[in-house]
């Protein structure tokens, strides 16, 4: 795949996962997970693919497979902070588009990565672009692990929340608080996809921004940018992405998929 515009893909990878230790180095069909993610980023047409990690073992693994790697500090509170360090170290120009490809998503669609980068380029007033897809069932809308996003008329985010937004009052109120009895939403509801493209000038600013109260309450780092006045363009795609790897069960599922592909 050839991207219509240059962008840099950065894959943050940390070993200290509480639910799945050493996750970036987990074997998927003979290669570490982080390498599989980097391969997907390369397929997306990134001008440069970098893995950012505080672990030398991760850097060594990706370099063995021909990818560039950057050693970062171990105390970053988020992947965005890790990207900010990379942008500063490598001196990216203000307009460089940097895509954060999560290190635990080896099945991510390369076309989506490319499209989110292009979406940011098409929205010069926005510092960030991300993606979302429609959801239609009440159990999805009311699931706090599904982050919802409300958009304005131009497809720019108004708010992200774990709560059921927008709230279909006439549909939901008669059944409240019996979530199991809730009908389908009566207006479009979008689930956020955790893929981000940033302008490098914003990444340099991000570590200086104070944490926002809404960010702390929702535990959603993108709300810090919005709290401080930045705009986030949202690309709506019709299809849900492949799930990432958070637990041993997730890892076993994806390992089985890679084994089946090898047959």
UniProtKB/Swiss-Prot annotation:
GO terms for cellular component: cytosol. It is an enzyme of class 2 (transferase). It catalyses: 3-deoxy-alpha-D-manno-oct-2-ulosonate + CTP = CMP-3-deoxy-beta-D-manno-octulosonate + diphosphate. It is found in: Cytoplasm. Gene3D superfamilies: Spore Coat Polysaccharide Biosynthesis Protein SpsA, Chain A. Keywords: Cytoplasm, Lipopolysaccharide biosynthesis, Nucleotidyltransferase, Transferase. Its EC number is 2.7.7.38. One of its GO terms (biological process) is lipopolysaccharide biosynthetic process. Its main location: cytoplasm. The keyword Cell membrane does not apply. InterPro entries: Cytidylyl_trans, KdsB, Nucleotide-diphossugar_trans. Pathway: Nucleotide-sugar biosynthesis; CMP-3-deoxy-D-manno-octulosonate biosynthesis; CMP-3-deoxy-D-manno-octulosonate from 3-deoxy-D-manno-octulosonate and CTP: step 1/1; Bacterial outer membrane biogenesis; lipopolysaccharide biosynthesis. One of its GO terms (molecular function) is 3-deoxy-manno-octulosonate cytidylyltransferase activity. Belongs to the KdsB family. Activates KDO (a required 8-carbon sugar) for incorporation into bacterial lipopolysaccharide in Gram-negative bacteria. This is 3-deoxy-manno-octulosonate cytidylyltransferase. The gene is kdsB.
């Amino acid at each position: 795949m050839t991207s219509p515009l240059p962008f840099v893909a950065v894959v943050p990878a940390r070993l200290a996962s509480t639910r799945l230790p050493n996750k970036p180095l987990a074997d998927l069909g003979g290669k570490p997970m982080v390498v599989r993610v980097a391969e997907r980023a390369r397929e997306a047409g990134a001008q440069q693919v970098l893995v950012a990690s505080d672990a030398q073992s991760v850097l060594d693994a990706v370099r063995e497979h021909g990818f560039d790697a950057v050693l970062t500090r171990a105390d970053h509170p988020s992947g965005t902070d890790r990207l900010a360090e990379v942008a500063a170290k490598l001196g990216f120009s203000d307009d460089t588009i940097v895509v954060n490809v999560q290190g635990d998503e080896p099945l991510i669609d390369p076309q989506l990565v490319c499209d989110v980068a292009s979406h940011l380029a098409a929205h010069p007033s926005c510092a960030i672009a991300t993606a979302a897809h429609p959801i239609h069932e009440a159990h999805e809308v009311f699931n706090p692990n599904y982050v919802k996003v409300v958009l304005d008329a131009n497809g720019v985010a108004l708010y992200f929340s774990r709560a059921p937004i927008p709230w279909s009052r006439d549909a939901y109120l008669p059944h409240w608080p019996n979530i199991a009895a809730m009908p389908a939403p009566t207006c479009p509801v979008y689930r956020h996809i955790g893929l981000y493209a940033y302008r490098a000038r914003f990444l340099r600013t991000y570590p200086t921004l104070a944490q926002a109260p809404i960010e702390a309450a929702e535990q959603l780092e993108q709300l810090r940018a919005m709290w401080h006045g930045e705009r986030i363009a949202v690309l709506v795609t019709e299809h849900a992405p492949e799930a990432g790897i958070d637990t041993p069960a997730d890892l076993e599922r994806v390992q089985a998929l890679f084994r089946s592909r090898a047959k």
